[in-house]
Design a protein with these regions (language model features):
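Charged, low-complexity interaction regions
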Residues: 21-33
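Short amphipathic alpha-helical heptad-repeat segments
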Residues: 2-18, 35
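Short hydrophobic transmembrane-like helices used for membrane targeting/insertion
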Residues: 42, 73-74
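Non-transmembrane amphipathic alpha-helical segments
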Residues: 16-23, 42
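Acidic, low-complexity, intrinsically disordered interaction modules
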Residues: 32-63
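Short intrinsically disordered, low-complexity segments
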Residues: 6, 25-27, 39, 60
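Short linear proline/tyrosine/threonine-rich motifs used for host-factor recruitment
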Residues: 58-60, 66-73
Length: 74
């Protein structure tokens, strides 16, 4: 992996990550597939970087809105 690729991954992680929970957004139905794809990409990158990934997925809130989440131990 080149230094540029490492910086790109670090920037992506910094953009989406907090210590415990991150990448949490409410999205309309049209955006679900796109966002799930993004979460899966981030999930894989975090594993490649050697961090322990706890959970990734989607929850349906009581008001029927969807919330996406990704938990990681960094």
């Amino acid at each position: 992996m080149t230094e540029e690729q490492k910086r790109e991954i670090e920037n992506m992680l910094n953009k989406y990550s907090r210590r415990k929970a991150f990448a949490e957004e409410e999205l309309d139905e049209d955006m679900r597939c796109l966002y799930e794809s993004k979460i899966n990409d981030i999930f894989e990158i975090i594993k490649i970087m050697g961090h322990e990934v706890k959970c990734a997925g989607m929850v349906k809130l009581p008001n029927k809105e969807y919330k996406y989440f990704l938990y990681s131990i960094i």
